[in-house]
Amino acid sequence: MNITYAALLEQVKSYQPGKYHTTRNYTNGAVTSWSPYISRGFLSPVLVMEQLKTKHNKQEWIGFMQQMAWREYFQRVWQQKGDLILQDLKSSQTNIILEQLPLPIQNANTGIHAIDNAIHQLYDTGYLHNHLRMYLSMLHSNIFKAAWLPGANWMYAHLLDHDPAANFLSWQWVAGTFSSKKYIANQDNINKYTNTKQVGTFLDTEYEYLQTSIIDDSNTIQSKHLVNWPDPLDQKFEIDVATILKNIEKKNQSKIFDINQTSPNTPYCIYNSFNLDPLWHTDEVVNRILLLEPNHFEQFPVTEKVLQFIVDLAITNIPGIQIFIGNFEDY
């Protein structure tokens, strides 16, 4: 998914936003797939807005920009609340039965074809349509009745567009801890927006029965599900951050920070996984460093595939950049 900045700008200039508002909830809708670049600070939402406003009337671009505004809203909540976004914000999650990640989700073995295919796509590409994120999080939190944070951590780790604010607050919205009620969807809803026709699943029921379709009112897993699913049903999801950072260092040895390759008495521009702006101080002679801090990735782990995407995007678009793996205070 890596791309040059010039090529991405051409996509922005040629994008036709008119169908976005009416089709964005469908998995084959007119979405852009720009979120990895916006989340990395590589593509400016302001630039996108300016381009769309220049070439299209308000009726065409307003729906797109309203969705962009949600990301900005989540950022402002994170800015105000800090790490509290990792806890139930407005109300406590109710009826938690599982404390970790349900294995049918981790193993893409839920039996819901659209969801299982989406999990495979997430693992393979780091991309997941927004509606499928909602389906996955509601299945995890409200149907499997699992604590929302382990699921949010799992999804965050695999997304190329990982963003603590948007990810964790969206999961809280679905779980009902950052909204007035829990979000649920049945099989008919999933079929409609994913262009599938599956029937006979545990979600193929009326809404009033959905939240007891796997775990009943006595908090017991219905025995019919245990034929295809493991017992226990959940497992802790973990990522070995230290090993991943070592692998990144080995794969990108020629770009690893070397003090002898820097210019003395020259300012530094320090980039990170949320600031890969290719236009940042481009008219100045500076030392350019991509900072990958173990402390950050211990708190917000990502997979090696995601981290390599960040490195590749930086190397492709920021001339002369070096990679420093360490915490800022260690430099």
Residue ranges and their predicted role:
Residues 137-143:
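Hydrophobic/aromatic-rich effector regions of fungal transcription factors
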Residues 138, 153-156, 162-176:
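Metal-dependent DNA replication initiation modules
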Residues 132:
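Active-site-proximal cofactor/substrate-binding loop regions of enzyme domains
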Residues 187-251:
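Long, charge-rich alpha-helical interaction segments
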Residues 166-208, 330-331:
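Beta-rich, aromatic/charged-enriched effector core domains that present basic-aromatic interfaces
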Residues 2-5, 12, 17-66, 70, ...:
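Trp/Phe/Arg-rich N-terminal binding region typifying the photolyase-homology
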Residues 101-122:
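Helix-hairpin-helix/helix-loop-helix acidic hairpins
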